[in-house]
Each structure stands twice: as C-alpha cells, then as structure tokens.
Amino acid sequence: NELIEPSGSNDVVTALSENVQRIVAAGGLASINHPNYKWAFGYSQLVKVSGYRFIEVYNGHHLSNSEGDLERPSVSNIWDQLLTSGKKILGLAVDDSHNYHEIGPDLSNPGRGWIQVQVNQLSKNSILQAMSQGNYYASTGVELGELVLNKKQIRLEIDESATKQPNE
C-alpha cells in the first residue's frame, strides 16, 4: 500500500527495469501494460528487462494498438517472441476502461477484457498468489465452467450461458 515512485530515466529499458524492480521490492507483481500504445516499446526493449511476470496481451482501449499494424507486430506476437527467448511471462487481458456513462466502439468501456482468478478465498494475498502461480485465465468474452488438469487429462468446459457474445 505504499506509493511507488516512477523512474526518472528517459531511457526506455532503464525506466522499465527500475520500475519493475521497485514494484517487486514493494511486494507487487510487475506487468508490462499496453506496450503498443503510441508504439511505446517492443520486443527489442522488453527482452532486456528482467523481473516482470506479466504482459498485457489484450487491451480493450481503442487506441492501444494491441493488434499491431502493417509495420509493427501485435502484442501477442511480441509475447510469443519473449516466450521463445526463454522469458516466463504470463498474459493478461484488460478493458482499460475510462468511459462508464456512454457506450461506443471508440470509447474505452468496461468489460472488454479481464482476468478470472481461481482462489479459495477472496483476499489480496490469495489473488496475488494465484496470479503469480498462473492460476487464472485472460478473456475478452469467454468464461470457463470447469478446468481439469492432471497427469491423465486436460479438460476444459466453456460456460456458454456466461460467455459474452460479440457486441454485447
């Protein structure tokens, strides 16, 4: 619950590294958020930064550039490159909502992306621990009903009644 002062560096890698170190030192889980927003940073910078556990693979804000463009890769592709390089980073989806009273495709409305965390107790520590262990999934609409994962099987059921349909 302490304020973490941001790095004062103008160098992207240095600023990201210092910010990640400060977040981790304060007991937090560091995430790289909307890396394609204003094309802020990509694989060549992120591969040089250590200590972050998550990358925002999907951001529901219409200006986040999550999908990339003809010249720049999507955040999913950047994530794939980071995983291929050996980094163990988990993906997140968020809505990045800023607009709550008016709904529209060019507005940053809630519910476009989220994570669903599997916990036995609704507490800050339980949620942080589950996220750190990867006991969550990121979604832009699908809700899971049951997930069974063991040495004999992997079974996934989608809760169709709770799953958002496009344009809902």
Tell what function each PLM region has:
Residues 7-108, 145, 149-156:
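Domain-core and long-helix interface of multi-subunit machines
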